[in-house]
């Protein structure tokens, strides 16, 4: 891991730019944040962006029209920084919600991918002393969360 101080909002904007150009014209992508622009926190930039890009890419794959929203928050989970990616796609069926982070888990066999992306996100989150979750209460599509504590040292 390559830990250094980074600006939260800049990391999110870079992740958005790397994915947004692939969005169909019927899908609006946007980023919002309640984090000050100058807010710094220590993380592994590449690993954090890998998780965000995976979440955004999955949202793009499964959203034919509507929107994809990346949000960064210091208030959703106090003492932690929360990144969320929400989309207006078909969502995750309740009977498959508990296995989305399992290796080789694919909810749609007709979509491109190996079923490893979310599992890798889970591993990265663990190494950063954080967690990834599916928001099972979200009803507008799918919403994935990447939650990092602000005071812990990631595993190497």
Regions found by a protein language model. Give the residues of each.
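Conserved micro-motifs of the catalytic ATP-binding
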Residues: 1, 40-43
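Acidic ATP/Mg2+-coordinating residue in the GHKL
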Residues: 87
């Amino acid at each position: 891991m390559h830990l250094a101080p980074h600006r939260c909002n800049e990391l999110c904007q870079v992740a958005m730019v790397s994915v947004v150009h692939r969005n169909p014209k019927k899908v609006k992508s946007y980023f919002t944040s309640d984090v000050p622009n100058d807010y710094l926190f220590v993380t592994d930039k590449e690993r954090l962006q890998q998780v965000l890009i995976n979440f955004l890419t999955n949202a793009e794959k499964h959203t034919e029209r509507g929107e994809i929203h990346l949000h960064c928050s210091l208030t959703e989970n106090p003492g932690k920084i929360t990144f969320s990616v929400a989309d207006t796609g078909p969502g995750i069926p309740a009977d498959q919600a508990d296995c989305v982070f399992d290796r080789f888990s694919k909810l749609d066999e007709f979509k491109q991918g190996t079923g490893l992306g979310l599992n890798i996100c889970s591993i990265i989150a663990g190494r950063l002393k954080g967690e990834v979750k599916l928001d099972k209460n979200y009803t507008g599509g799918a919403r994935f969360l990447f939650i990092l504590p602000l005071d812990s040292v990631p595993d190497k």
